[in-house]
Amino acid sequence: MEDESYQLFKTDICGFCARVQQFMTLRSINIELRDIVNDELARQELLKGGGKAVVPCLRIKNGDSVDWLYESMDIIRYLDERFSTSRA
């Protein structure tokens, strides 16, 4: 997991984004947040990389590869699996 880095693309008015952020807070998971409403560069990056400007979206960079994970519950499951092993 050392080579992985994460960014959560979100908006302040998105309930599904809030769900992911609440989970991150409860688990003390610190990931860079990118607001696609207030940051046009973030919106463009999400659109170019992920193929759609839909939030929430977790950008997962692992070495040279980048994956884009949409859907709040999928993001929560992924974070739960990734960070529960490192917290054991």
Predicted regions mapped to residue ranges:
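Structured beta->alpha junctions
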Residues: D12, D35-N38, D64
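Non-catalytic, surface beta->alpha helical segment in thiol-disulfide oxidoreductase systems
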Residues: N62-R87
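Amphipathic alpha-helical interface surfaces
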Residues: F16, V20, A42, V54, ...
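Residue-level detector of conserved, well-ordered beta-strand and adjacent loop positions
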Residues: F9, R59, Y70
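Structural micro-motif
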Residues: G49-R59
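Thiol-based oxidoreductase modules, predominantly thioredoxin-like and allied folds used
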Residues: I29-A42
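Short, charge-rich, low-complexity interaction segments located
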Residues: R43-K48
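Local sequence-structure signature of Cys/Sec-based thiol-disulfide redox active-site neighborhoods
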Residues: M1-I31
